[in-house]
């Protein structure tokens, strides 16, 4: 198969996985900053997140990560040397609106991403930017229960409008949410929900929150298209490949 000459070969990063600097230049904590690594109880924390904001773990990978916040110029240069033509990135919501409810955005955060996207462009790398990659502002989790509350839709719209307008000439390709369906599988990871998987109201809470995210995603697309009709905006779905253990019919039935 012959690919088009403008096919976007690239790599991917996410703010909570690479930036670090979790409380610098006005940024406040987000949901990912309370998750420990796999060796210190990450899976249990995600499935039973009721006390995650108060629990103290030995190590939080997102708080330092690979220090991309301070070293992005070096990292972009190295990525360019590898020959990539596109780089998936995400914006940390709390770098722009630290609590999610400020009337005015944080200029330090806006400037950082402007410089980051400009650096990508300088090396001929197309930024593909996600608005929300598993990082709900802590303040919105505590006050509203994160995406369980419809009021997050308007706050997300404000955030989306701010970054769409600021980077209208730097970014063409956008994603509203990373793995938007993950909120139904691991609610804390996907949407900052503190609901336990054993809660009898689990399905009601989770699917209501998923609905709110879907509405917010649609609203963001509408906003973005008004700001720049040339924007290409979508979202990302989580998926996995599974195979029967063997060709035994019982395994095949179990798989389906």
Q: Can you name each region flagged by the protein language model?
A:
Residues 1-56, 99-101, 110-255:
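Active-site region of glycoside hydrolase catalytic domains
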Residues 66-78, 153-163:
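Short, acidic/polar
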Residues 67, 104-106, 149:
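Poly-acidic low-complexity segments
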Residues 71-92:
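Catalytic domains of carbohydrate-active enzymes, especially glycoside hydrolases
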Residues 91-105:
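Glycine-rich, proline-tolerant flexible connector loops at the mouths of alpha/beta enzymes
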